[in-house]
Amino acid sequence: MKTFELYSSSICPICQRRIPMRIYEDEKDNVIYLEKTCPEHGKFEDVYWGDAELYKYFFENWNHAKYIGEGVENPHSKIVKGCPFDCGLCPQHKTHTVLGIIDVTNRCNMACPICFAYAGKANYVYEPSFGQIAEMIKLLRENSPWQCNALQFSGGEPTLRNDLPELIAEAKKAGITHVEVNTNGIRLAEDIKYFKKLKVAGMSTVYLQFDGLREEVYKKLRGRGDLVSIKKKVIENARKIGCNSIVLVVTLAKGINDNELGSIINFAIENHDVVRCVNIQPISMAGRAKKEEMRRLRITIPDALKLIEEQTGKISRYDWRPVNWPMPIAKGMEMLKGEAYPEFTMHPMCGASTFILVEEGNKNSYSYAPITKYIDVDHFAEVFWRVYYLSLRGEKTKAKLEMLKFLPDIKSKLIRELIKGVVTKGNYEALGKLMNNVIMLGIMHFQDVWNFDIARVQRCAIHYALPDGKLRSFCTYNNLYRDEIEKRYSVSIEEWKARKKKEITEYA
């Protein structure tokens, strides 16, 4: 029986043509599936969301018109073929850049079996020059109406570049407030001086690959079994240099590390002086399989939420909210402070997050609870919507009173004072102080060609800045554009080695 039904568009996994897609509920297993048919390559089925009840909870509450953005005022491409084939961003895109990504190299000192973006597989080196990267940063900062202020340097392995500290400094000089480095951590574990250079240059956060606490996990996902000690050494070195913002980034694979989520969260809590977030990324799929087989292999956002519920016993699946939940906070603060804020107008099915408040006990013991135990987050969001609409009518004093009336309802004094600081100061530093007292848990399910939903793509807020002068959404770039762009701006491995007098796995 199929009770919930919705229509969108997708692409054929084989020829990439745009095709209609149906999203529907199968009551037999409480799962949301998708099906799409290419006139040339036939029918494809996949799991869209692993829990129909959670899907409808997110979709019905956070897919309203007021959660849909208007995109950028200065798109970099025209509509010719239609989404996703004009990505640049084009006028069809509905969300501005909340996080920019720049791949500074495709070289890497690992050869992960699951990776799609390193030189050893590609047989060429993609490594934009300092000048090209400076132009990409400028491209992000020229976005209108929101000048992107958060940037991730990624790869490949970005720490293979000796000039990464200078690139970070360049981003800070251009007005980027938050600069994070996406890394496997090997160089940060081995070379504390280099780690310190990154911090001194202005690195805000280490976005650390962290798939679990057992070497068997890394053997399967990363092809080597000596990485747990390396991850722990990065944590240790972070303390030594005063870096107190590490995100543990979990590539989640069914049957490999899906039983590790509780222990990873506990590890974050034990190291909450430096760990600010655990971000979970369900692995993308490759290859064609039947519907039943895809259900066995595919792990989706609600699957992970239920695993966390089971493994922690403290964090319920209903303690999470979709990634666009902060939208009213941005709109309300914009009206109160008279300045722009990033608008989280992503599709509610793209991800979810919650926060946990950690309290220290005796003898290095910690207790924690999700933020929903201290604050009615949905009422909090509604208060900010009221603040926004009252301010629109010119009633700012009344809007501020609405906010003040809500503060006594917050059960935690710490959270109450921190939220008061965010509201009254309304700047990035105040928000950072709030984050320093809690751990964020996040999950983002990046798409592959099998579950590709154009409705999601058009609302993506994570955009690659590229040397051709365009911005492309994360899932569009990785599925449709990466190979072509990298090849266009690459050199052969032999040419790179001759120029640098180094192997491609060495620091240069």
Predicted regions: what they are:
Residues 30-51, 59-62, 66-183, 187-193, ...:
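Conserved alpha-helical substructure of the radical SAM core
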Residues 134-152, 161-282:
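Radical SAM/AdoMet-radical enzyme domain recognition
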Residues 119-127, 220-225, 293-294:
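Short glycine-enriched, charge-decorated loop/helix-capping segments at active-site entrances
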Residues 33, 99, 205, 247, ...:
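Broad gene-expression machinery/nucleic-acid interaction feature
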Residues 1-80, 86-88, 340-508:
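Radical SAM enzyme core and accessory elements
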Residues 240-429:
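Radical SAM enzyme [4Fe-4S]-AdoMet core and its adjacent flexible, acidic
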Residues 118-123, 213-216, 285:
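A short, flexible beta-alpha/helix-coil linker loop
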Residues 102-104, 116-119, 155, 183, ...:
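Glycine-rich, histidine-containing beta strand-loop boundary motifs that form or position
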